[in-house]
């Protein structure tokens, strides 16, 4: 099982993993997820309140690597939130291969490119830092810089945590695993302790590369996190049945 976990977190950047950190360019401009009709369980009339804008800022796990249109995490999350009556529009700002340093470079560009200020930002980065064995201290500093940008604009955050595998070594593992809970506490943001927990030891939910989630794997990630997202939205109603045990600060 540790080997499977390492294969997931170590090669999230299958496309473009060897390139240098890209400068923000128009090609990195986030795209709004299609606002197609929500599923039958949530007709448009059932959607409550104004549009809730959510920014999904991350790497290939948000970018929908090798998935058909509409099957990525941002799209499926939007549908799941609408099924709960939340009038959500999720903007996909995932870029395959991004490290925390890449995210730090482009966060301001992404925020300046948005038509509306997000009601919530999902921050999901760090897997590619594991791939390259990059310094946990640098990863933490980069994530802190991203959170600083969001804090300055008064944008609430849900931080998607990652965990290093045991074969990364006990010292590296301890340092890396401490990043996300420490930042969540420092910045008073909500935390999903380990974003990949629903799929990391379930090969049937992974693509042939044994790295990226299949469409069913994405649905498992959404099912495990949709209530965390809903709770992180200021003023959003959340069903009691959906309560989970993940950290909420």
Where are these regions (language model features)?
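Bacterial signal peptide processing site
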Residues: 17-21
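Serine-esterase "nucleophile elbow" of acetyl-processing enzymes
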Residues: 30-96, 106-117
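Alpha-helical cap/lid subdomain in secreted, periplasmic
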Residues: 86, 104-249
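Conserved Rossmann-like nucleotide-binding pocket used by diverse enzymes
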Residues: 13, 89-91, 158
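Sec-dependent bacterial lipoprotein signal peptides
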Residues: 1-15
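Short histidine/acidic/glycine/proline-rich micro-motifs that form metal-
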Residues: 61-64, 68, 94-98, 128-130, ...
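Glycine/acidic-rich beta-strand-loop module
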Residues: 24-25
């Amino acid at each position: 099982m540790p080997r499977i976990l390492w294969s997931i977190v170590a090669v999230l950047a299958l496309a473009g993993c060897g390139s240098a950190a890209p400068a923000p360019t128009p090609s990195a401009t986030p795209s709004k997820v299609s606002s197609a009709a929500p599923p039958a369980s949530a007709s448009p009339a059932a959607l409550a309140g104004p549009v809730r804008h959510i920014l999904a800022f991350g790497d290939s796990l948000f970018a929908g690597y090798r998935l058909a249109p509409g099957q990525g995490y941002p799209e499926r999350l939007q549908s799941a939130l609408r099924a709960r009556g939340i009038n959500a529009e999720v903007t996909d700002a995932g870029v395959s291969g991004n490290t925390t340093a890449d995210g730090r470079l482009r966060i301001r560009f992404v925020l300046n490119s948005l038509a509306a200020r997000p009601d919530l930002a999902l921050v999901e980065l760090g897997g590619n830092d594991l791939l390259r064995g990059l310094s946990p201290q640098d990863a933490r500093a980069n994530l802190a810089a991203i959170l600083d940008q969001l804090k300055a604009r008064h944008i609430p955050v849900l931080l998607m945590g990652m965990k290093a595998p045991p074969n990364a070594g006990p010292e590296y593992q301890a340092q890396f695993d401490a990043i996300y809970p420490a930042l969540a506490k420092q910045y008073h943001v909500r935390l999903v302790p380990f974003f990949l927990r629903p799929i990391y030891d379930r090969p049937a939910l992974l693509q042939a590369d044994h790295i990226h989630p299949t469409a069913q794997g994405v649905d498992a990630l959404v099912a495990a996190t949709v209530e965390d997202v809903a709770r992180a939205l200021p003023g959003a109603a959340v069903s009691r049945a959906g309560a989970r045990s993940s950290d909420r600060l």
